[in-house]
Amino acid sequence: MLKDQNLDIERKQDHIEINLTKNVESTLKSGFESIHFIHNALPEINYDSVNTTTTFLGKSLQAPILISSMTGGTTRARDINYRLAQVAQKAGIAMGLGSMRVLLTEPDTIKTFAVRHIAPDIPLLANIGAVQLNYGVTPKECQYLVDAIKADALILHLNVLQELTQPEGNRNWEKLLPKIREVVNYLSIPVIVKEVGYGLSKKVAESLIDAGVKVLDIAGSGGTSWSQVEAYRATNSLQNRIASSFINWGIPTLDSLKMVREVSKDIPIITSGGLKSGIDGAKAIRIGANIFGLAGQFLKAADTSESLLSEEIQLIIEQLKITMLCTGSRTLKDLAKAEIRL
């Protein structure tokens, strides 16, 4: 057991370091580069009246942005999460925590995840890998994770390719959907299911919605490739070659968004995976997202300073607002109907 605990911590440290220092981008594009807004040269809107507010999980957001799940469990991760929470609270945006499985075996790691005292007002998302339900994690333990950080929802992330390219990865993905349904029925708060960078298909979205999942985070291809991250962690050439061969795997984010929105016009969708700017976020809103998530650039900024992170988030918000004005969109509902060309 101690060996497994140490491995969890070591893996989290590796993931931070590799994401900060190596090129782990997918060779696929997100797809949003193919979408272009029709410029409105006479928008007849005052910039100060552009309204980016929305609601998510019953709470108000000043902008439709999620700091996507990244890290936790280590001292460095604690510092990163504290900065993320501080800036998210000030900006009025949502925040996801990294995988909290380690908290089930190492209670002292709670201090690396517990940020509610820093961010009392924002939607805060707990997180654990869905496959852990096949390895002994119970609905009761999922509720414990939620309660431990006073979360507004629980993310169950789907990371099958990452697990299969990880030396110590979990390989049993059989009969997982019924267990997801059990967690949905047990928890006192909504369950979000999130991919980690390879996209959700129409068929998977249908199954998850039928199981009672309340929000989907499509996390398509075009951003961080976790198989590439695991290629850097490989302990031998065979593992490296296996992981590296999946650098261009997955459903591009735009395609996944369209697929999932076809399944349901009502399910809240978080769009993440390869979004680089508020302009990309605006495109996601236009195609059917409710909010959009970013991780990589926020991680790099948060590892440096709170001020740099604050500037990065302000950049995204200003890009979004300018895009809205230049498309004649006073609100996010207007943006969802803005003229585009493909």
Swiss-Prot record:
Reaction(s) the record says it catalyses: isopentenyl diphosphate = dimethylallyl diphosphate
Localisation: Cytoplasm
Entries under Pfam families matching the protein: FMN_dh
Listed GO MF terms: FMN binding; isopentenyl-diphosphate delta-isomerase activity; magnesium ion binding; NADPH binding; oxidoreductase activity
> Where is this protein chiefly located?
cytoplasm
Function, in words:
Involved in the biosynthesis of isoprenoids. Catalyzes the 1,3-allylic rearrangement of the homoallylic substrate isopentenyl (IPP) to its allylic isomer, dimethylallyl diphosphate (DMAPP).
Quick one: which residues bind Mg(2+)? E163
Please give the subunit comment from the record: Homooctamer. Dimer of tetramers.
Per its record, how is this protein called by name? Isopentenyl-diphosphate delta-isomerase
* The organism of origin for this protein: Rickettsia africae (strain ESF-5)
